[in-house]
Each structure stands twice: as structure tokens, then as C-alpha cells.
Amino acid sequence: VKIALISPAHPLRGGIAASSERLAIALQEAGHIVTIYSFKLQYPAFLFPGKTQYSEDAAPLRLHIVPLLHSLNPLNWFISGRVIAKSRPDRVIVRFWLPFMGPCLGTVLRIVRRKSAPGLRITALTDNIIPHEKRPGDLLLSRYFAHSCDDFVVMSRSVAHEIEYVLGAPTLVRLTKQSAIAPIRYAPHPVYDNYGSAMEKTAARTALGITAKAPLVLFFGLIRAYKGLDLLLEALQYTPHIHALIAGECYDDWAAYQKIIEQHHLSERLHLHLHFIPTEQVKLYFSAADLVVQPYKNATQSGISQIAYHFGVPMVVTKVGGLPEIVAHGASGYVVAPEPAAIADAMQDYFTHHRSEWMREQVRAARGRFSWENLVKTLLK
């Protein structure tokens, strides 16, 4: 099958780009021909508070990536639609994660359909359809996009219900396995297995400049208000023996977090790496950590959980969105309320009762259900 995958990809950075590149490899391994149609311009400056949208990593091998789309240029949308249609794909898979992309992607897909042979199927791999940080007009933009698609694959059941809401038609939601083909299908986010093998813990900590042998929890990824770093910092006041490694570029005003750090005298127990983490360094952070903490205030699915699964690190996640679907409470980690005391209790239990060895075994045992083969199969049903 010849597949057009419309998604950010190298040299653009971030979780969507990285996972789409890995998906393209999985599709190719399944015998399909894949072209990734990426963006010449993805975000305007007002939507991207980070330092750069571009990765310094080497381009992935064996992938055909075409930088084509411009999110702000309607003329480009029509041209892009014609270019993709001219390649005569048998299937189109499109990533959707932000309502801002609705006009661009919705228009491109309508042009692709109009210029293609009848029967072309367009499947949206939908990370989010209602964003974590809401803006006026989100619903209209997402609805415009959604009506350009034939079906949807979600990696969190909460997103399925959001699609139901956006389309205004409850009968569209079909999450059961009985249906061979359904408007909305579910497959959990696969494990990120493209970050190399785990390192020995002491070596990883040394490489990161961490000399302390204390229990170490990891908060990893871009720092935004909904990800709840403030909850973790508040929780650390109850666990004076635990250190925290904070790794990721801050998209918020750091002053609010610094105030909590100073209020609870946390500086000596924090290891701050407040920058975007390149691909080749990811293994250092997960190898150094005893426990990954995701204190999110709202979420759908999370790629961070799947990196933790790859490196065999247990997790503390909060009872929001699709996170409880990914972590088995008391086995591969803890599922707790998004409150400092609950997060602190989970961390305390893990270290006080020496749960590392057993929980790491559970994490390794659970990895099998998060396969790329399963996602490919679900997308192409």
C-alpha cells in the first residue's frame, strides 16, 4: 500500500515528529511505501515559546520526508493538496494534535480527496482534538478538520469522547473490538524504542553531573502549566530524602516554580536541566532515574510514559485523561490524584518499601502490549 503520512518530521523536533518517523519505519517494515509530508513552516512565533522548532539531530535514515506544508499560507494548502494527490496514495494518514492546524490540514485533505480517485481513505491519528490550553475558536477549527476525515485512531479513550463531542454525533464512537472497521478505533501509544539502550545508573548520573546517591525521580519533557511540575515541587516538601531531576525546556514563566523551590528550600535536592533534550541524551536521564513522575493536571496520552516503558522505569502518573490506561497501579507504577500529598505518598512508598526490582519487572512484562505493529494494524483496518 502506498501511504501519504501528513505530519511534522525532521528537521522539526518534538514528540509528534519523533513518533511519526518511528511510525513510518513500522509501516515500511510491514511492507508499505511511505512518504511523510511535513511542514515548511509549522508554528508562528506566538504559538511557539521555545528557543527553536528545529532539531540538531541527524536526519533519520530510510525515510522519505518532503517539507511541504505552510500552516499560515492558504495558497500553499491548495498546492500541497494537489502535490499529495498527484503522488496517488492508496491511503492517507494525518496527525492531528492542535486546533490551530485545522484550517491548514482540513483544506489540504479536502483538496487531496477532490483530486484523487474515488474511495481514497483518510485516517486521522488523533493525539488531541480539544487542546490542553484552550483558545477561542478551538471547537470550530477542530470540527473543520474532523469533517475532512473518514475515520480516526486514538491513543487515549478520552480523545475518542472528545471527537464524539466535536462531531456532535455520539453514534460515531465505536471502541469495541467486534467491528472490523469503525469510525473511531483505539490503540495505545507504542513504546519509544528509538533512544538506544539503558545505561548503568551510576555512569548516567556521572554524565549528567549528579554525584548524589540519593533516590532520584525524573520529570521529563517540555514544562507547561498543565504538566503539573508545581505539584511535584510541592510534593517534595514531604519527602526530604528524595532528589528530583527536572529535564526539559520551560514554556512557562520559571519564576512561579522558583518561588516554590525557595519556599520549601528544595534547591539542594533539585538537578535542573532546563533545555530541550536531544535524542542521543534521552537515555542518560531515564537511566539515571529510579522513578518517573508525571504529575499532569490534564492529559490525553503521553509519550513520556512510553519512553519510561522502553527503559524499564516505573512511573507515578495522575488520574487524568488516558494516563490510567497506560500504567497499572501497584504494578508498573502508581496512579494517584493530581495532588502533592498523593504524589508524595507514592514516591515514599516506592523507596521506603524497596519496590524497584519488582516494579521494573512489571514494566518490562507490560511492554509487549504497546507495539508499533498493533498501531499499524489499527490504522490500516
Functional labels for PLM-detected ranges:
Residues 170, 196-210:
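A short helix/loop element that forms part of the nucleotide-sugar donor recognition site in Leloir-type
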Residues 329-341, 348-355:
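Conserved acidic donor-binding segment of nucleotide-sugar-dependent glycosyltransferases
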Residues 355-381:
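A charged, aromatic-enriched C-terminal amphipathic alpha-helix characteristic of glycosyltransferases
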Residues 17-18, 215, 222-238, 306:
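A conserved mid-protein helix/loop that constitutes part of the nucleotide-sugar donor-binding site
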Residues 284-301, 310-313:
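Acidic donor-binding loop of glycosyltransferase active sites
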Residues 7-13, 25-86, 159, 250-253:
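N-terminal strand-loop element at the rim of the active site
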Residues 39-43, 220, 243-258, 275:
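Glycosyltransferase donor-sugar binding loop
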Residues 257-283:
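Nucleotide-activated donor-binding/catalytic signature segment of Leloir-type glycosyltransferases, i.e.
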